[in-house]
Amino acid sequence: MENLNLALVSSPKPLLLGHSSSKNVFSGRKSFTFGTFRVSANSSSSHVTRAASKSHQNLKSVQGKVNAHDFASISSSNGQETTSVGVSPQLSPPPPSTVGSPLFWIGIGVGFSALFSVVASRVKKYAMQQAFKSMMGQMNTQNNPFDSGAFSSGPPFPFPMPSASGPATPAGFAGNQSQATSTRSASQSTVTVDIPATKVEAAAPAPDINVKEEVEVKNEPKKSAFVDVSPEETVQKNAFERFKDVDESSSFKEARAPAEASQNGTPFKQGFGDSPSSPSERKSALSVDALEKMMEDPTVQQMVYPYLPEEMRNPSTFKWMMQNPEYRQQLEAMLNNMGGGTEWDSRMMDTLKNFDLNSPDVKQQFDQIGLSPQEVISKIMANPDVAMAFQNPRVQAAIMDCSQNPMSIVKYQNDKEVMDVFNKISELFPGVSGPP
């Protein structure tokens, strides 16, 4: 007992001396470890075990609650992930009403590719025609000096003329010279009179021929003076050659128009002939001015120029060709023939009013398929089959319908042409929702 009282006195907490209760002792030593106890009673041991058991139970219950809470949080987070996956397709339809779905932009890209494919073919023909025309002009310029030199020297034509003028100068000389000239003129007259038989018989006697030749010599001295001057003769011949060149250029222009019509078929010829009436009946939303404005955008140039011929990759060349009235008229007729329905044209017009591929709204739409507008249009431009199939009005209407409501694809299950286009688009762009 004395040891116990000393232990109690040495404790940091103040306790009553001479009073020992098991409850107070153990309640005061809850903070110590069980290894420090040297004195223990039966009742206290049972109390300690119970407290330990309760503490273990409390720990287990707390751990169970923590585990349950963790499990609940994990399950709830998983539930949020699943719901977010299910909700994400439902969030895609609202943006198309404001900006346009990626499918609509794919349709615009297909339209661009179809347009520029036809433009490329036109430009190739135009470039070949210009090259051929320039080559013909060079050949004419090379032939003109040769022809003028030939006419100035006078190998073919001047031979008969000096024959008539030759006797005019030696008219007053001796008889030998007159006989030589008469024999020479006689030989030449037989050559000229050999064509009709009656004139040959009439010209058979020699004296008659001499008389006629003398009469002709007397009547033609004035002409010989004009014939002897070579510059006037060359000027006349050059004028004739120029007139010939004008006829050749006009005939080339006339022959070029039927060639273009035959290559493209009769429908294009009718459309080109009826150009004043066709725009009034049907006018495309994409005009030549809008096309020229879009081609001034550097991003559009980077997308389109690699697929155009080399003659059109220069912006100045493209602008020069767009200012050509003939080419501009043909391009307008082609755009009018490519125009789709009124709904498509109105929506495309609204989209192209503020045409900006770098706008954040457009980028947000293309993020759904994981591509940029440049990549979309470049992929379509690299596949001319899709571009040519887009010229079908039914395909345009189907893309317009499915861009607003992806479930409308069910209506086109039996249309092979439409489904082929959708299948090609889905192969090129797997992230596009709507078509299979």
Curated annotation (Swiss-Prot):
The chain crosses the membrane at residues 99-119. Gene3D superfamilies: 1.10.260.100. It is a single-pass membrane protein. Residues 297-331, 373-412 form the STI1 domain. Residues 120-436 are stromal. Disulfide bonds: none annotated. The keyword GTP-binding does not apply. InterPro entries: STI1/HOP_DP, STI1_HS-bd. It holds the Pfam family STI1-HOP_DP. SMART domains: STI1. It comes from the Eukaryota. Residues 1-39, 40-72 form a transit peptide. The keyword Lipoprotein does not apply. Induction: Down-regulated by cold stress. Its main location: plastid. Residues 245-257 have a biased composition (Basic and acidic residues). Residues 177-191 have a biased composition (Low complexity). Keywords: Chloroplast, Membrane, Plastid, Plastid inner membrane, Protein transport, Repeat, Transit peptide, Transmembrane, Transmembrane helix, Transport. It is found in: Plastid, Chloroplast inner membrane. The STI1 2 domain (373-412) has a stimulatory effect on HSP93 ATP hydrolysis. Part of the Tic complex. Interacts with HSP93, TIC110, TIC62 and TOC75. Inserts into the inner envelope membrane from the stroma after import from the cytoplasm. The transit peptide undergoes a two-step processing. The initial cleavage to generate the intermediate found in the stroma is mediated by the stromal processing peptidase (SPP) while the final processing step by a signal peptidase I-type (SPase I), possibly PLSP1, requires association with the inner membrane. Involved in protein precursor import into chloroplasts. Part of the motor complex consisting of a co-chaperone (TIC40) and a chaperone (HSP93) associated with the import channel (TIC110). Causes the release of bound transit peptides from TIC110 and stimulates ATP hydrolysis by HSP93. Involved in reinsertion of proteins from the chloroplast stroma into the inner membrane. This is Protein TIC 40, chloroplastic. It comes from Pisum sativum.
